[in-house]
Amino acid sequence: MPRLPPALRLLQPPLRCWVVPKLHVSAKPARTPTSPAEQAVGLSMMFLSFLVPAGWVLSHLESYKKSSTA
């Protein structure tokens, strides 16, 4: 057990160097509230940006398989 304090001293300097920046969180409401239409458009664009490329790849999967074996 006498070796434990020197080992702990080796771990202390890296822990002191890690400084976590303070977040700028505001409790105030938004200056311009987002309308439900804007929220719907934004949400649908987010879903489309992920689903359209995945659908493209899945629909052309057979052609990708054929071109890679040739």
From Swiss-Prot:
Keywords: Membrane, Mitochondrion, Mitochondrion inner membrane, Transit peptide, Transmembrane, Transmembrane helix
Recorded GO CC terms: mitochondrial inner membrane; respiratory chain complex IV
Annotated TM spans: 36-59
Cellular localization per UniProt: Mitochondrion inner membrane
Protein's recorded name: Cytochrome c oxidase subunit 8B, mitochondrial
Main location (coarse class): mitochondrion
Topological domains, Mitochondrial intermembrane: 60-70
InterPro entries, alphabetized: Cyt_c_oxidase_su8, Cyt_c_oxidase_su8_sf
Pathway assigned to this chain's UniProt record: Energy metabolism; oxidative phosphorylation
Mitochondrial matrix face residues: 25-35
A Pfam family it matches: COX8
Topology versus the membrane: Single-pass membrane protein
The protein's role, per its UniProt record: Component of the cytochrome c oxidase, the last enzyme in the mitochondrial electron transport chain which drives oxidative phosphorylation. The respiratory chain contains 3 multisubunit complexes succinate dehydrogenase (complex II, CII), ubiquinol-cytochrome c oxidoreductase (cytochrome b-c1 complex, complex III, CIII) and cytochrome c oxidase (complex IV, CIV), that cooperate to transfer electrons derived from NADH and succinate to molecular oxygen, creating an electrochemical gradient over the inner membrane that drives transmembrane transport and the ATP synthase.
Transit peptide residue numbers: 1-24
Record note on quaternary structure: Component of the cytochrome c oxidase (complex IV, CIV), a multisubunit enzyme composed of 14 subunits. The complex is composed of a catalytic core of 3 subunits MT-CO1, MT-CO2 and MT-CO3, encoded in the mitochondrial DNA, and 11 supernumerary subunits COX4I, COX5A, COX5B, COX6A, COX6B, COX6C, COX7A, COX7B, COX7C, COX8 and NDUFA4, which are encoded in the nuclear genome.
Gene3D superfamilies the record matches: Cytochrome c oxidase, subunit 8
Family: Belongs to the cytochrome c oxidase VIII family.
GO BP annotations, alphabetical order: mitochondrial electron transport, cytochrome c to oxygen
